[in-house]
């Protein structure tokens, strides 16, 4: 594996870490309706656990309400039950073929707890990015030791990996600040 491949591989893994952070933060309720928080819910569809997005269309009715419209009328009860039984603490209400999921307002205390969770997620992602940097640097040192790349190449690649790490950390901080702001907005 060359230094360029190591850099490319590390960059891809860092981007995956950022995407993972974004998806995990999307599941954190902020008081504002976001269909993304229902994505991980599975519905019992004729005996098979199926993602909610495959059995119903998700949309926003207003800033605090998500509309869930099952593709089959017979699935309304199952979808409603799956949402109610999820760990999100939501209380869906069925209106014919449409299920309305109101997002309850968050208390100040709950908002503060959620910001702590967000910070923790961000810190975990930063640790993952730093571990990727460490692994890449170790790999580069091995290549230098085995005389596959020169010390200058190693130094250049290490500097570039450090720049990628710094950029990823800045991106993580931006994402965290944005989510905290979203949570704290009443």
Curated annotation (Swiss-Prot):
<dbReference type="InterPro" id="IPR036191">
    <property type="entry name" value="RRF_sf"/>
</dbReference>
<dbReference type="Pfam" id="PF01765">
    <property type="entry name" value="RRF"/>
</dbReference>
<keyword id="KW-0648">Protein biosynthesis</keyword>
<dbReference type="GO" id="GO:0043023">
    <property type="term" value="F:ribosomal large subunit binding"/>
</dbReference>
<dbReference type="GO" id="GO:0002184">
    <property type="term" value="P:cytoplasmic translational termination"/>
</dbReference>
<dbReference type="InterPro" id="IPR002661">
    <property type="entry name" value="Ribosome_recyc_fac"/>
</dbReference>
<comment type="similarity">
    <text>Belongs to the RRF family.</text>
</comment>
<comment type="function">
    <text>Responsible for the release of ribosomes from messenger RNA at the termination of protein biosynthesis. May increase the efficiency of translation by recycling ribosomes from one round of translation to another.</text>
</comment>
<dbReference type="InterPro" id="IPR023584">
    <property type="entry name" value="Ribosome_recyc_fac_dom"/>
</dbReference>
<dbReference type="GO" id="GO:0005829">
    <property type="term" value="C:cytosol"/>
</dbReference>
<protein>
    <recommendedName>
        <fullName>Ribosome-recycling factor</fullName>
    </recommendedName>
</protein>
<keyword id="KW-0963">Cytoplasm</keyword>
